[in-house]
UniProtKB/Swiss-Prot annotation:
Residue span of region Disordered: 60-81
Keywords: Cell inner membrane, Cell membrane, Membrane
HAMAP family, A to Z: UPF0161_YidD
PANTHER family membership: MEMBRANE PROTEIN INSERTION EFFICIENCY FACTOR-RELATED
Record's protein name: Putative membrane protein insertion efficiency factor
Family: Belongs to the UPF0161 family.
Compartment list: Cell inner membrane
Membrane-spanning parts: none
Database matches in Pfam families: YidD
GO terms under cellular component: plasma membrane
Length: 81
């Protein structure tokens, strides 16, 4: 299942994304973030992190540098802030 998710993202990156204007608000791009998140954290947690990232990608968010969290950090932990 993990390989299928990664393959789907790669197809998007190489076949669909080049036809669209590059306008991702974040670095790395959302598709690169999703790949790294799934490769680092697995399909379940990586997929959740990717969905949260896509939810933040809208015109009212300034964007910027947003790396995939490491294994020993959590976005929901008050200590990580």
């Amino acid at each position: 299942m993990r390989k299928l998710a990664i393959a789907s993202i790669r197809v998007y990156q190489y076949a669909i994304s080049p036809m669209m204007a590059s306008h991702c608000r974040f670095y790395p791009s959302c598709s690169c973030y999703a790949l790294e998140a799934i490769e680092t954290h697995g399909l379940l947690r990586g997929g959740w992190l990717s969905l949260r990232r896509l939810g933040r990608c809208h015109p009212w968010n300034p964007g910027g540098y947003d790396p995939v969290p490491t294994h020993n950090t959590s976005n929901s932990s008050p200590m990580a802030e």
